[in-house]
């Protein structure tokens, strides 16, 4: 069998999940001692590296047409991978513990396609027995999801694998609340001219009220003429404040007092 070395090296160190990985002791050929190697199982291929972080594998074992069995060896927790045919030498491996031994034997025994074919055959027999035993609940010969074509959405046809549900009449939405209408006692809606005249009267009344207030403030004004304070007091009586100051002129809300020093005591 011809294999691409680059493809195997990439497959051995890629980021895909592995079926099993760990350190095993591998016995060399011609009765040499064992070496501790890092083994990685991916599918039906067993890679072994010099160390855990090595970038290239030292070797590869294709797990097809082989059996995994326990052996008596110098190493504890030893097992062997044997191939059919007298020319193929077995691979004797040893784990660090009993749990690791059981895990490796189970994983290697289930790695070949031969094991998968046996599993598929067993499942087919169980399925046939279930169909014969319960005809009422028999499964269809070729179960396939029902594809229901749906209308196009955004130019693409949407397919659904779910079974069709019984059609149910859609529930009507709750009725909308009635609109507010003008009562019959109020008569027809007023026109724009009527509204303009009605609110115009109110605006005019407010303007007249404001003008009346302005006229009342203007009556409190005292005209001021240039001259001395004595001349001003002779023409008109002066208004006195709480401190005896004479008020010469009143500007609606602002007063300009001139205090008489002689009137502080009065």
Swiss-Prot record:
> What Pfam families does the entry give?
PH
Q: What is known of its domains?
A: The F&H motif, an approximately 12-13 amino-acid sequence centered around Phe and His residues, is essential for binding to OCRL and INPP5B.
Signal peptide location in the record? none
Q: Which domain of life is it from?
A: Eukaryota
Give the record's GO CC terms: clathrin-coated vesicle; cytosol; early endosome; recycling endosome; trans-Golgi network
Residue ranges annotated for the PH domain, each copy included: 17-113
Q: Which GO terms describe its biological process?
A: endosome organization; receptor recycling; retrograde transport, endosome to Golgi
Q: Which organism is it from?
A: Mus musculus (Mouse)
**What is its quaternary makeup?**
Forms homodimers and heterodimers with PHETA2. Interacts with OCRL and INPP5B. Interaction with OCRL may be important for endosomal morphology and function.
Q: Which GO terms describe its molecular function?
A: protein homodimerization activity
Instruction: Show the SUPFAM superfamilies listed in the entry.
Output: PH domain-like
Q: InterPro entries attached here?
A: Boi1/Boi2-like, PH-like_dom_sf, PH_domain
This one is known as Sesquipedalian-1
Q: Where is this motif: F&H?
A: 191-203
* Annotated stretches, region: Disordered: 165-184
């Amino acid at each position: 069998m011809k294999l691409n070395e680059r493809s195997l090296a990439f497959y051995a160190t890629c980021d895909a999940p592995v079926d099993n990985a760990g350190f095993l002791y591998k016995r060399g050929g011609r009765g040499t001692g064992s070496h501790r190697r890092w083994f990685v199982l991916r599918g039906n291929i067993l890679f072994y590296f010099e160390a855990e972080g090595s970038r290239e594998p030292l070797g590869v074992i294709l797990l097809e047409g082989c059996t995994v069995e326990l052996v008596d060896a110098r190493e504890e927790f030893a097992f062997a991978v044997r191939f059919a045919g007298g020319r193929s030498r077995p691979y004797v491996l040893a784990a660090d513990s009993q749990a690791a031994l059981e895990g490796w034997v189970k994983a290697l025994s289930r790695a070949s396609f031969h094991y998968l074919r046996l599993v598929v055959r067993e499942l087919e027999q169980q399925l046939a027995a279930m169909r014969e035993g319960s005809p009422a609940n028999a499964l269809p010969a070729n179960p396939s999801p029902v594809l229901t074509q749906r209308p196009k959405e955004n130019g693409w046809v949407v397919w659904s694998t779910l079974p069709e549900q019984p059609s149910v009449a859609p529930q009507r939405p709750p009725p909308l609340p009635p609109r507010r209408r003008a009562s019959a006692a109020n008569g027809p809606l007023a026109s724009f001219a009527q509204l303009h005249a009605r609110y115009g009267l109110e605006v005019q009344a407010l303007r007249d009220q404001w003008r009346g207030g302005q006229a009342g403030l203007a009556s409190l004004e005292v005209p001021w003429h240039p001259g001395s304070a004595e001349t001003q007091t002779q023409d008109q009586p002066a208004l006195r404040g709480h401190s005896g100051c004479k008020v010469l002129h009143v500007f609606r809300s602002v007063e300009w007092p001139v205090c008489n020093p002689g009137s502080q005591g009065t």
